[in-house]
């Protein structure tokens, strides 16, 4: 599809929730992974727009926060001290700046993935010259972001549409 001349990459967005939000941000920065990394690919996809819904942006921070009952250690095959190269290549925050447009939507009372994950990403992205947007939703937790019946849903839709204008 991306080879089709009618395909407008500027009007597409990668969107994910939680671990999927991590992957959306990671894919947007994957072109910055060093050639020596096992995560490097010469067949990368260009991502112009990424939406993270309560995503994990920093695997080192997620490890320190003990998110997911040890899932980060299992995903990365060890701790940040044991495999710093894996954490660097797998953490979206370490791949900044990306040049992509990012919108991070996060509930202020999310107790699954703390909003500090999105705040840290936005702060670092801004320092490095990217211009991300953080949509912080008061009284919203983790799963409301993917519930079309929740009060958070209009903000999620708005985040996506803001990247497609």
Predicted features, each with a name:
Residues 12, 102, 131-133:
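Hydrophobic anchor at the start of a short beta-strand
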Residues 17, 106, 142:
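Histidine-centered divalent metal-coordination motifs
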Residues 56-67, 103, 120, 127-130:
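Alpha/beta-hydrolase
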Residues 61-94:
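Mobile cap/lid helix-loop segments that gate and shape the active-site cleft of serine hydrolases
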Residues 104-106, 110:
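Short beta-strand/loop motif that positions the catalytic acidic residue
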Residues 112-165:
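C-terminal catalytic histidine-bearing segment of alpha/beta-hydrolase fold enzymes
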């Amino acid at each position: 599809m991306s080879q089709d001349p009618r395909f407008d990459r500027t009007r597409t967005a990668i969107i994910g929730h939680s671990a999927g939000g991590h992957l959306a941000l990671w894919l947007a920065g994957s072109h910055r992974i060093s050639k020596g990394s096992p995560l490097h690919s010469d067949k990368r996809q260009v991502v112009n727009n990424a939406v993270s819904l309560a995503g994990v942006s920093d695997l080192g921070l997620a490890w320190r926060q003990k998110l997911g009952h040890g899932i980060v250690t299992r995903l990365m095959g060890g701790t940040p001290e044991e495999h710093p190269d894996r954490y660097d290549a797998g953490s979206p925050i370490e791949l900044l700046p990306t040049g992509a447009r990012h919108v991070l939507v996060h509930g202020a009372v999310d107790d699954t993935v703390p909003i500090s994950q999105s705040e840290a990403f936005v702060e670092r992205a801004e320092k490095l010259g990217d211009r991300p947007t953080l949509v912080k939703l008061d009284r919203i937790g983790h799963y409301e972001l993917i519930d079309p019946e929740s009060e958070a849903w209009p903000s999620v839709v708005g985040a996506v549409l803001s990247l497609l204008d």
